[in-house]
Amino acid sequence: MPTVLTPPLSAKPRYTLLDGLRGVGALIVIIFHFGEAFSTGWQSQMMNHGYLAVDFFFILSGFVIGYAYDGRWRNGQMTARRFMLRRFIRLHPMVVLAIILGAAAYILQGCVRWDGTPMPPESVVIALICGLLLLPAIPYTMMDVRGYAEMFPLNGPQWSLFFEYIASIFYAIFLHRFSTRWLRIFVIISGIGLAACTYANFSGGYTMGYGWSILGWDIIPCGGLVGGLFHVSFCFGIGLLLTRGFKPRTGIRGSFWICSALLLAVCIAPYITPDGDISMLNATYDLLCTFIILPAIVWIGANGVTTDRFSTAVCENLGNLSYPVYIVHYPLMYLFYSWVWTNSIT
């Protein structure tokens, strides 16, 4: 019986439509961050659930990586070292650019924390080096130059890249070896952990991961290392699970626009609360979106095709811009926030 070889990576068709959806998610995150400048609380965001786009990124990442690489491990065409080198080349150049821009923005703002406390030049150098090496800042130390207990105070969204690297390492060492049964168990356990952290952080949502804490809710109520780990484990894992036995169905026409509308609807939904206060109903909404709706959007997109030049061009351009725009936009947001708050603009 002849041996069936997995075709080389370049032979697999590229999911241009999913690239386009990644770009839509990046734009949603930018709008979410823009609206934070005028927000008075969790209930008054311009894009109340914009942070769910990051969950979408993690799910999409798991799906695309599983689609592109799972077969190559089985046939010895991929090693952990080669895989991580590919991820490093793909991700890290823009991380370097973003953290340098973040340091420049911080210097332009006068090297002060949010409360006006001046920070010495060496603290900026330390934060810059840690950011380049993707080492999270220890809260309330010289590394925490903005004083928000962020993992990466010079470029806040870099927390998601930190967890993306963790997911990639875990995939290279363990997850690609898991049978579908064990991968399903991994996803279920991660989902239980994610739900527990979501209801335990008392924010009515689970914007977890950007803050550095021990248990997930002991330093800032909506952050946490543990919450972030469950966050990426479930999302990345369910993305991988979607690829197991995946056989694209007949192309769903208009699926890019359908999926874009669904993703926008999920993220633009108002904060869910019966009395105007922080509510666990909103946390339940977040979990339902991540457990069911966002994976469904990825599945629909993976089964879809672009059938006209305009849609194809939109997807290609959004895909090319998605990661660079996502990872470098926040240094400009720091300057924008400073301008808005200094001039009391509402």
Residue ranges and their predicted role:
Residues 2-17, 27-50, 66-78, 139-149, ...:
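Alpha-helical transmembrane segments in multi-pass integral membrane proteins
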Residues 18, 83, 91-94, 160, ...:
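Alpha-helical transmembrane segments and their helix-entry boundary regions
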Residues 24, 35, 57, 162, ...:
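Active-site His/Glu-centered metal-binding helix of metallohydrolases
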Residues 51-54, 71-112, 117-134, 167-168, ...:
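Transmembrane alpha-helical segments and their boundary/interface "anchor" motifs
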